[in-house]
Amino acid sequence: MGQVNSSFENAVNCCDARSGSRRPSFVKDYNLVAKSLKKEERVTLSAADWEREALEFIAEQGVQALAVEPLARRMGVTKGSFYWHFPGREALLEKALLRWEEHDSRNLNKSLGEIDHPRDRLVSFFRRVPREKLTHEVYSELCAAAGHPQVEPVLERVADRRMQHLSAAFEELGMDPERARNQARLTYSVYLGFLQLQRQNQTPNLSSGAFDDYIEHVITTLIPG
């Protein structure tokens, strides 16, 4: 659409230069429509829409692949719509990562913060995995880009938050603080290992009975009865 608009305008400008005449009314009408469409793009798509689509993009193709032009094409709009909300790609990535982190924090509070019994909290942590597919796919791709300057601090904050919740739950189950921290590390290592195996197609499908069996095995193995 952008190339067509540009070609049309170039042709009109060329005609104007040769004829020295004023632009005909249909050209003015065209310009009004074009401006209206651009304004509609900016109004229709919010910054949140771009952030959500960026997270979907990251989940599918990784952090390094995220770029303005393919993202705009994927959303069926021009890059002008993007620049109405963000000064550049880094700003979008920062906002998208913040959105993901806040979503993860809310989920963590639901699975580990709002349940009274510590064992039930830990069980909920694992059983939420298949219900939060996008969250875990994004996290997997962020781990693959852990050295990225915008990704690294987000991963550190998320890991710290999760480890604190896990350690607290194991302490409430009767473990001393050091053992609880070690058990939390082991539990979180299993989760991270699962994400790596998933990237290599070595895990059951998240919606399969085999995956449910795997989760139950992890729960039985890692969480005291």
Each language-model region and where it sits:
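A detector for short, charged/polar N-terminal pre-domain segments
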Residues: 39-45
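Hydrophobic/aromatic residues within well-ordered alpha-helical segments
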Residues: 89, 96, 100-104, 118, ...
